[in-house]
Amino acid sequence: IMKHRILALVLAGMLTAAATACGSTNSKTSKNADAKPTVAYKDMQVGETATDLKADLKILTNRTDLVDSDFQDYISEFNAMYPNITITYEGITDYDTDATTRLSSGDWGDICCIPTTVDKSELSNYFEKIGDYGDFKDTYEFADKQMFNNEVYGIPTMGNVSGVVYNKAVFEKAGITELPTDPETFLADLKLIQEKTDAIPLYTNYAAGWTLTAWDAYISGGATGDADFKNNKLVHSKDPFAKHDDMTGPFAVYDTLYEAVKQGLTEEDPTTTDWEGCKAQINEGNIGCMVLGSWAVPQMQAGGPNADDIA
């Protein structure tokens, strides 16, 4: 189902690119405000709409692990219906930084994962809207995440939950039989990994930068038990980052990272961490765990021969 939806989005981008020459200018904005897509997204039928259209499309993606595998299957399936469309995927490791720079210069392509650096109010400066929210809300979860003034500029390709990706074999070797449920136990388990294995207990991926934002996701429901905390209560709290006696709340999240580094439970030199390389390292048991999200699990499983060790 998701592949079908992604192909539909590519079709939308194809028609928009044909109508607006999206991404072909050198100005800050890569859209033609007067041009409109020839067919509305809600009216498109994959395999039926505009099958005779010719175009060349470049798609920027942060999923460097899929460029030469799954995405090639997407292209083949799409070309079976649209043989005159040439699609090229370009994977970018430091996605937010590089994609933002290229958006600003206008030299980026036709379709991309919208960088987190783009403010919602600026979406129309770089992208064509693909429809009104009403066209998507009953079909897609989180369709409002890249929306401004009820106009949708991007739809999600997946939904994730925050968490800790870990190597089960490393935890077992360290004698950890139950997963930690509080910061104190988590730090104690990292200490066990340090003492009883050769693995780096907690790998921060500091050098990549964007990976550290995974910690920010914890300050909401994960740290407070309140799903409304981050969006509705954080900004109205007098001292939201104060230390609580029960070690809940945002302070506990960032303090856990601070204590892990302070106690030497992370890599020796955080400036030399390697995002792509960490996938093989955790798969091979050289890393105990990383704070990321559910999206990272399959990438770490594909990093080596020990997929069953990753959870």
Predicted regions and their residues:
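Short, well-ordered beta-strand elements
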Residues: 39-43, 52-65, 85-90, 111, ...
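Extracytoplasmic/periplasmic substrate-binding proteins
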Residues: 58-62, 119, 255-311
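Glycine-centered hinge/linker elements that transmit conformational signals in sensory
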Residues: 190-191, 235-270
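Periplasmic solute-binding protein
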Residues: 122-124, 142-179, 205-236
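Hinge/lid segment of periplasmic solute-binding proteins
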Residues: 34-49, 115-162, 169, 187, ...
